[in-house]
């Protein structure tokens, strides 16, 4: 992981005009991405992830604020930025009539590579992404996972310093998603900085060295996955009772081992110290008041707990 910042933004904003008035899709985003990291932008659909990514990739001008990529200002030196980056949109961008090899060679030629060099580079990418056997087949015959890997390869033809990936595993089955994670880790191992957007909690947790959680165009938390989860103290205990949930919260919130107690979608959610030791005490207290839990689950804090703590909403339900 690097220490120098290859991406920096300061108070980045983007406003769109709408019938109901101006909509600020990106509302003062300030962040830094270290060279060689996998950086994740985690948030629900409509949070401002893709808009921010498009600004950094010079596809959309910011309304205000500053952003630099590889030392170049995205607004004032976009051509220099584009030579340092690869960009893979969620929808991809490959031509369905061409073969995988042809698409890679075409991309290399667009970056002024000689034909022979582009052909060599195409073969390197096909081998690295395990697409060599399908290299001369039309892309229309590729599976979703193969097309996604090819699109990443297209973004890597010119060996960019930074690769932007917009929701790289959306729509993939679990096996294809796990394989894509391995490919992204390989990019980091080769020295490429990866900036990806995702609404998958497990993806952000498994892949990212650092991440920022964004909601309504604003960053609400940032750090490594473990640092963020440590912000949610103790264990998370969720209790389902038949009615009287507010009474249960009042009974439990003042216990010495309960850090926080609240209601979420009809369930009592507690943040407790040493949850396995707390459960017997809680059960005895509820039983003494004639209350019998219908369900009870205990888990370590997750990134969803971080999102819930910062926004009052569950990212799993928001993204569903």
What are these regions (language model features)?
Residues 181-273:
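ABC transporter nucleotide-binding domain
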Residues 82, 126, 229, 249, ...:
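Conserved protein kinase catalytic domain
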Residues 4-9, 14-221:
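ABC transporter nucleotide-binding domains
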Residues 274-320:
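C-terminal coupling/interaction segments
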Residues 14, 31, 239-241, 270, ...:
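Preference for bulky hydrophobic residues occupying beta-strand positions
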Residues 66, 138, 236, 260-262, ...:
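Residues at or immediately flanking beta-strands
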């Amino acid at each position: 992981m690097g220490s120098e910042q290859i991406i920096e933004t300061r108070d980045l904003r983007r406003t769109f005009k709408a019938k109901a008035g101006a909509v600020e899709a990106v509302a003062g985003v300030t962040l830094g991405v270290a060279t060689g990291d996998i950086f994740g932008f985690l948030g629900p659909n409509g949070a401002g992830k893709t808009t921010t990514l498009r600004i950094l990739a010079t596809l959309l001008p910011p309304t205000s604020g500053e952003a630099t990529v590889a030392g170049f200002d995205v607004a004032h030196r976009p051509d220099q930025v584009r030579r340092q980056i690869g960009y893979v949109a969620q929808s991809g961008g490959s031509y369905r009539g061409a073969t995988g090899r042809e698409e890679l060679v075409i991309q290399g030629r667009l970056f002024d590579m000689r034909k022979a060099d582009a052909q060599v580079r195409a073969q390197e990418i096909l081998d690295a992404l395990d697409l060599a056997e399908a290299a001369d087949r039309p892309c229309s015959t590729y599976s979703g996972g193969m097309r996604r890997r090819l699109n990443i390869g297209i973004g890597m033809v010119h060996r960019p310093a930074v690769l932007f990936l917009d929701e790289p595993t959306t729509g993939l089955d679990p096996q294809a998603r796990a394989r894509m994670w391995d490919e992204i880790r390989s990019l980091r191992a080769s020295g490429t900085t990866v900036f990806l957007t995702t609404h998958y909690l497990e993806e952000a947790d498994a892949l990212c060295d650092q991440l920022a959680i964004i909601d309504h165009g604003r960053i609400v938390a940032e750090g490594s996955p473990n640092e963020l989860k440590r912000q949610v103290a103790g264990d998370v205990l969720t209790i389902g009772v038949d009615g009287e949930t507010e009474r249960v919260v009042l009974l439990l919130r003042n216990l010495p081992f309960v850090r926080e107690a609240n209601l979420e979608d009809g369930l009592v959610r507690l943040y407790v110290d040493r949850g396995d030791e707390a459960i017997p005490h809680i059960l005895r207290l509820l039983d003494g008041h004639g209350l019998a839990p219908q369900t009870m689950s205990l888990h370590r804090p997750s990134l969803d707990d971080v999102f819930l703590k910062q926004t009052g909403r569950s990212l799993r339900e928001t993204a569903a």
